[in-house]
């Protein structure tokens, strides 16, 4: 889960984060309970038959039944484009998405990031 992938896609109007990722050929897998609103796997990571290997939970295998484990999950981050940057505005900075990927509306210029979080360690993109 340490591989970085970056893609820039041209869009002309509003699109959901789920549609954006599908158009970029990323494979998203949701959970049995929450469907595609929750990202359980991204490009088959974490692997469905291999322990995640997170310290303190070395033998845990993610089954994608309900919410992913609090110690190992994909964080969905968004960054809103703005014409004139305002340092006091959260727009233009990476922030936690407030809705699931199937509902998260993205517009031209917005950014979307998925960061695999282990034991609460979130590494926000630059």
Task: Map each language-model feature to its residues.
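Ubiquitin-like/PB1-type beta-grasp interaction modules and other compact soluble beta-rich domains
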Residues: 1-126
